[in-house]
Amino acid sequence: MKSHRTLYKSAVFLYLIFKGKRMLHLTLEDELFLGTPKQVGTHSTVFEHFAVMFEDDGETGYFYALDMRQNAQPIVDMLHVYNVDSTSNHHEARKLEICWDESGYVALLLINGYPHAVFDFARLVGYNSNKYPQPDLMSMWTREEITNKQAEQWLGVKTIR
């Protein structure tokens, strides 16, 4: 019998994470070494035109919101996640996960189980720890800072950061 990990890798199997009363769909799980270039992304579990992508270019980590209906420029927002030179132990492996909530509108970037960046496509809000960068002046997106209280609401469990 195949393990869940094998099924996920071979058949794009969706894990369901039950966090309190909220259900999150784990659509991507990977290993992350800060400063090692990486680009990974997933589509919403409900709306095929919404997608998110994480990128580490070797110096910084960013999380991007994409609306595939925007042919000329599908990236509608981006959030700073980290600067490699400002992190400690950046050569240690970290667990990278992207989850979508059951509505298909909220995407969470989890690193070692904590939400470092979140996009709410329904409310057009990007959440991260430093509200950087600010959205384009012509954008309808806004910024909010992630708090432990919000993280607990999204995950349904107590968090300590």
From Swiss-Prot:
InterPro entries to which the protein is assigned, alphabetical: UCP007050_HI0931 (IPR014449)
One Pfam family, short name: DUF2251
Protein name: Uncharacterized protein HI_0931
Species in which this protein is naturally found: Haemophilus influenzae (strain ATCC 51907 / DSM 11121 / KW20 / Rd)
